[in-house]
Swiss-Prot record:
Its EC number is 2.1.1.271. Pfam families: TP_methylase. GO terms for molecular function: precorrin-4 C11-methyltransferase activity. Keywords: Cobalamin biosynthesis, Methyltransferase, S-adenosyl-L-methionine, Transferase. Homodimer. NCBIfam families: cobM_cbiF. The keyword Lipid metabolism does not apply. This is Cobalt-precorrin-4 C(11)-methyltransferase. CDD domains: Precorrin-4_C11-MT. Belongs to the precorrin methyltransferase family. It comes from Priestia megaterium (Bacillus megaterium). Pathway: Cofactor biosynthesis; adenosylcobalamin biosynthesis; cob(II)yrinate a,c-diamide from sirohydrochlorin (anaerobic route): step 4/10. The gene is cbiF. GO terms for biological process: cobalamin biosynthetic process; methylation. It catalyses: Co-precorrin-4 + S-adenosyl-L-methionine = Co-precorrin-5A + S-adenosyl-L-homocysteine + H(+).
Amino acid sequence: MKLYIIGAGPGDPDLITVKGLKLLQQADVVLYADSLVSQDLIAKSKPGAEVLKTAGMHLEEMVGTMLDRMREGKMVVRVHTGDPAMYGAIMEQMVLLKREGVDIEIVPGVTSVFAAAAAAEAELTIPDLTQTVILTRAEGRTPVPEFEKLTDLAKHKCTIALFLSATLTKKVMKEFINAGWSEDTPVVVVYKATWPDEKIVRTTVKDLDDAMRTNGIRKQAMILAGWALDPHIHDKDYRSKLYDKTFTHGFRKGVKSE
């Protein structure tokens, strides 16, 4: 038995990978997170495929359904939003499935952090400014490990991408400030990146909570923070070594500067 776990991408049905789409179109049974995955994408399933929504299922119910269908000899795919590796809760599914002898293939997808960066026309790693991106979430009802508190992570002063934190912006602001961030540090909030009702909000650490409330954003938002998100970054002249004419690498010999 084999299960395919497919990353659907951030929203736009055209952003699923070619491989993911092929598997979706071949599957006899499609289980998908209906609260987050585009119906337009799922509509590309093959005619006659059994399509099951999982938002209302608990773990054992979902895994049991997949096992039942695979034991009937059917090709089953599990479609997750974004990339399954990021907050996809796939490990708990895999543990139960592997106990039953199921082989698993994971097909990666475009995660919302990079869709949000694209929407904001941002590069998250700017030479001489920041070369690090931290992907994390604020601590809410679900705790984070002791050494992963946002205040501690933010002390690196790099670009930070916050998943699952739209209702925790007051806490986010406090932890950024406690980490030594200035109140005018740029923040970009992208609501439903790549969906038709996508919204981009540019703000600062100081005004983050007000901006979220003003725009009515309470879920499905990616928060990008740090000076790489400076709205005036395009007026500056940060340059990488990669395309510097004096820089030598395996595909090009640099020339001496005059």
